[in-house]
Regions:
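Short gly/ser-rich loop at a beta-strand->alpha-helix junction or flexible surface loop bordering the NTP-binding
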Residues: 1-165, 309, 317-332
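Surface segments flanking catalytic/ligand-binding clefts of nucleic-acid enzymes
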Residues: 137-332
Length: 332
């Protein structure tokens, strides 16, 4: 176990052990947000902020841990964000929880602990999270894991909580999640393409995220694998070639070997009749560059692109300001 259990409250009446615990001090950060079901048990000070819960919670909203504390489930954690963060940030958090990635920047103390555990092999390689390293072997803040929430669960929970405070905003945000993504880059691209024009996006519908594509025999010979996944796969009308937008993040696409692999993959997909559009972070983060990208996508999917009105441009600038952030600070 990376962290020891919290001290029992009976032996930690002044909560010194709670405040100094590695999970509190080095991972969660101060203040820690607590759920309280009784007004008399609310605790608000420098290190904790209490949120009063007066209604009965749906089953599964509170989960037990091996650390001597109970925690809000991923779904209920997201729901509690709905009243406190920008809607775009809520959508981004939903993408992360429903996706196969997390962004976690360890403090120096936790980094040293991870190094010691890794060198001593105390944690199995299949313990749940795998850190992504760059092509040069550099550690990153990006981690791989299984989704914390299924997309269907998100929709069902949104329907169940509509009448609660923040429920309508939560439901709106949930409907904006287009699929399962594998990186912040894929989330940002998905939001730019799918968000309604009146909210700053392009309003392109009809694409799915990380669609599994079984390769043909000839495509397998080119790429050396039996399947691949399309980051964004657009369904193109009138029998035209389906469009795949590939998000080529610098972390794993920054060396010669990666370039060769990407080229083989693109050729294999083109051999099967797909149109493949590589997309770099610079192309979406720079608004002038993205103008070329969105017009290319519109042309490929058979949409007559219409220039944005001054109001739509202001909404786009606001959307970009919200999504192009340091992802490690999301929700804070």
């Amino acid at each position: 176990m990376l962290c020891p259990p919290y001290p029992d409250r009976a032996t930690d009446s002044n909560r010194t052990g709670f405040r100094s615990h590695i999970l509190t001090h080095e991972i969660l950060g101060i203040p820690v947000h607590l759920l309280a079901t009784d007004r008399k048990r609310r605790l608000n000070n420098v290190s904790t902020v209490s949120h009063l819960v007066t209604n009965e919670l749906p089953f599964g909203c509170i989960q037990q841990t091996d650390l001597g504390i109970s925690t809000a489930s991923p779904l209920y954690s997201l729901f509690n964000l709905a009243s406190h963060v920008d809607e775009n940030h809520l959508v981004m958090a939903m993408y992360e929880f429903c996706g196969t990635f997390s962004v976690f920047r360890p403090s120096p103390v936790v980094e040293a602990l991870l190094d010691s555990i890794d060198s001593s092999e105390l944690l199995p390689r299949s313990f749940g999270w795998r850190r992504v390293k760059s092509s040069s072997g550099r550690k990153t803040d990006l981690w791989r894991r299984e989704p914390l929430i299924e997309l269907g669960e998100l929709g069902q929970f949104a329907d169940a909580m509509k009448s609660e405070r923040g429920g309508r905003r939560f439901a709106r945000a949930a409907k904006r999640v287009t699929g399962v993504t594998a990186s912040p880059f894929e989330v940002q691209a998905s939001m730019l393409f799918s968000t309604q024009r009146c909210k700053g996006g392009e309003g392109f519908s009809g694409f799915v995220n990380n669609e599994r594509i079984p390769l043909s025999t000839s495509a397998r010979r080119i790429y050396g694998k039996s399947t691949c996944y399309a980051d964004l796969l657009f369904d193109v009308p009138n029998g035209a070639s389906p469009l795949i937008v590939e998000c080529q993040g610098k972390v794993v696409h920054d060396d010669y070997d990666s370039a060769i692999s990407d080229s083989d993959r693109t050729t294999a997909l083109q051999q099967m009749g797909f149109t493949v559009m590589p997309l770099t972070y610079r192309q979406i983060s720079d608004r002038a560059n993205f103008d070329t990208v969105r017009r290319m996508v519109a042309r490929q999917i058979g949409v007559a692109y219409r220039s944005k009105s001054p109001k739509e441009i202001r909404c786009e600038i606001d959307l970009r300001r919200n999504i192009f952030i340091d992802w490690a600070t999301l929700g804070r």
